[in-house]
Amino acid sequence: MSNLRTLVFFATPPHDCSYLPDREATTMFVDPRAHIDKKLYSQLTALGFRRSGSHYYRPHCESCNACVPVRLQVGQFEPDRNQRRVLRKNADLDCKLVPAAFSERYYRLYAHYIEERHRDGDMYPPSREQFTSFLVEGATDSWFLEMSLDGELVGLAAVDLLDDGLSAIYTVFAPELEHRSLGTFAVLWQIEEAKRRELPHLYLGYWIKECRKMNYKTRFQPIEALRDGHWREMSTD
């Protein structure tokens, strides 16, 4: 059984940064041969690691610390006016958690989302193998939040259950329903689910000040950032 003291880590060679142009990044990975159970996964997440399929990673850049792990203190969260509007707008959705697994209807929504929203990114073109390796493989206590409208799947959020919270992995939605703000709605739903389970945190991954697509994370308050090995409430001024 692996534990933090026995884990082996590997660093990648420098590669193009996925978030900031004209920068190089280095990524630290946990040895993929290690057995990661829920307890160890929770400990790694609290240390700033994220899961992508069966891989656990953290930025390890020599000259840049722009990627900041953040988590929401769900017990102190109160939705603002815009977030309350999103909740009202999506009150007609049927939402349920199901075990993370491959299905064609999940993949169709995923592929549609990637093709319409991320054609210029490294996830294009989508494939069934990509979906499975990213969202299904390596799952420890992993779930999909189904969001359906009149029986049709319109949103899917991958979420992991940890010892001290939930970890929001990835969300896709029908691009033609962008006006519903389903990404925001998925986070709000996960906040309420963490509260229901009496878990203190929702881990939101990395916040990058200079990356516009990461800015949404600071709309959820109070948010904590992991800096210098300690979680502290983050000022967004």
Curated annotation (Swiss-Prot):
InterPro entries: Acyl_CoA_acyltransferase, Asp_Glu_LeuTrfase, N-end_Aminoacyl_Trfase, N-end_Aminoacyl_Trfase_C, N-end_Aminoacyl_Trfase_N. The keyword Transferase applies. It is found in: Cytoplasm. GO terms for biological process: ubiquitin-dependent protein catabolic process via the N-end rule pathway. It comes from the Bacteria. It catalyses: N-terminal L-glutamyl-[protein] + L-leucyl-tRNA(Leu) = N-terminal L-leucyl-L-glutamyl-[protein] + tRNA(Leu) + H(+); N-terminal L-aspartyl-[protein] + L-leucyl-tRNA(Leu) = N-terminal L-leucyl-L-aspartyl-[protein] + tRNA(Leu) + H(+). Its EC number is 2.3.2.29. One of its GO terms (cellular component) is cytoplasm. Pfam families: ATE_C, ATE_N. The keyword Ribosomal protein does not apply. Its main location: cytoplasm. One of its GO terms (molecular function) is arginyl-tRNA--protein transferase activity. Keywords: Acyltransferase, Cytoplasm, Transferase. It is an enzyme of class 2 (transferase). Belongs to the R-transferase family. Bpt subfamily. Functions in the N-end rule pathway of protein degradation where it conjugates Leu from its aminoacyl-tRNA to the N-termini of proteins containing an N-terminal aspartate or glutamate. This is Aspartate/glutamate leucyltransferase. The lineage of its organism: Bacteria, Pseudomonadati, Pseudomonadota, Gammaproteobacteria, Pseudomonadales. The gene is bpt.
